[in-house]
Amino acid sequence: MKIAIIGTKGIPNTYGGFEAFAENISVRLQTQGYNVTVYQPYTENNYLEPFESVSRFGVKVFRYLPKNLQRVHYNLSSLSILQQHNPDVIICCGHSPSIFFPFFSKAFRDKLVVNMDGLEWKREKWGVVARFVLKLSERLAARYSRVMVADSMAVLRYLMSKYRKEAVFIPYGAQFGEGAENDGCTEKYNLTPMEYGLLVARIEPENRIEQAIKAFALLNKKLVVVGGVNTPYGNVLTKRYATNRNVIFAGGIYHLASLNSLRKNCRVYYHGHTAGGTNPSLLDAMAAGCTIVASDNEYNRETLADGGLYFKNNDELMAAIKAIWNFDNNERKTMAQRCDRRVKQQYTWSIVVDKYVNLINSLTNEKA
């Protein structure tokens, strides 16, 4: 059976959540006998070597177009190519390609499984026009796809209430255990184990990066910020805090052992995401045994449950950081056990893949 995955920057993951999803789901489906192809953009060479036996197909993107137009062109080209390749099921990461769904046949649209992600239009970086387009693409995805997938129950409730259409809950998975307690990453950034905070996120306003920087600075504690800073917001923050000795901008790190080294040696893990959905970076922090302080919203509480502390404002954030900093070993161990139990019960990649296999088989009327 031929499965296509579109809507990401490709595999292996060097960007974010959808790319981590595409990498993990494609490799695992391939090992179960599915013929999986990940479609991803290219600007130079259209031949892409397979990754872990997963085929990769390069979709031409014209480098001289503005980035927004590159994305539009990439989405349309991906769908057009898929129409020729004729896969059995198309897993679409995000709903931005749905602007073009109405122009394709119903037979083609009946293959579309759209992972709606969080509520993209709520992200603070978007202006009025972008929010309108995102709301429109969300509505078109709901109307023209075969199945909507929600990665959290909160998003599932929103989709079913908003669009009166059945949706399926399938979360993301967590990466377990790879990486030594210290593989040299702490030395690279001149860090003392258990004497720094950690944040792993895309450097965007809705992830409350600056709120964390200010809180750790006021408490005179080091904070390591992991995430690509080559964004408008990233450029602002790196310039604004260039002389602040308490913040280290480590850039994007995609080597799992290095990330886990930073996670396992941090005193506090900060998760400020507010835009919704089950966030892979939070799951990975839980799997690594981090002691977590998270923004208090329904998405984070659904994922983390009683495995961390929460904050709604700056005062609560600083109080939570202080509390975690003063945890003894037993308190830290208790939090880690709660996270480990929750992840293994709901958020392993084997659970996620099983749910996608069931969905794929139900759509194609084949037995598991």
Positions of PLM-derived features:
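Aromatic "clamp/platform" in nucleotide-sugar-dependent glycosyltransferases that forms part
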Residues: 273-274
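Nucleotide-activated donor-binding/catalytic signature segment of Leloir-type glycosyltransferases, i.e.
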Residues: 227, 235-257
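N-terminal strand-loop element at the rim of the active site
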Residues: 8-14, 28-66, 154-155, 160, ...
